[in-house]
């Protein structure tokens, strides 16, 4: 069992409060995963220029997408988060090794992601154990300078890109440095030439919440992530065995 520092404890408390509030079904304050936040948005109907809604939606989307790749994460973003939006662990079912601690910084920025964001993630990791994996999850592309900053960092880091179109949201880029490779020597990525299960499948089409409402909510992120061609999804592979779900 590993001991977590203050950042993990802060997130744990946040999650506990959310679970308590969830029982009240007060959608103005109740959300702790992608589905509950989409329900919240369907009531609030925020403007597509609402950056807070954009950022929060992307954090929950990253949480959902990375869960398909064996990351168990909880959201702790907000005031005083130190640049960390999700915390948790990476563990592979039926594989006996100690779960790896993970912190994730999510950037829904439009445009390229430069080295400043990688350095900010490095700074955020300073209050966590040295074997904690830091992931920078983004909509935009990484510059060559950001990839160089990743490669020379002395902390285990990974860069991840997410594609969003409302029905299919998935990871299509995942790169890590030598420090991360030392932790996961048998882990690799592989392209798959088929789309993962539709993200829309996770939303219950009951009560007043319809699939049409769900898809329209992703307009908050679509203009930021639209590309000319749909990128090829990735899966994670451990010792030649695919460990990603729904792919």
Swiss-Prot record:
InterPro entries, sorted: Restrct_endonuc-II-like, RRG7, tRNA_endonuc-like_dom_sf
Biological-process GO terms, alphabetical: double-strand break repair
Record keywords, A-Z: Mitochondrion
Domain of life: Eukaryota
GO terms, molecular function: endonuclease activity; nucleic acid binding
Protein name: Uncharacterized protein C824.03c, mitochondrial
GO terms under cellular component: mitochondrion
Subcellular location: Mitochondrion
Pfam families, A to Z: RRG7
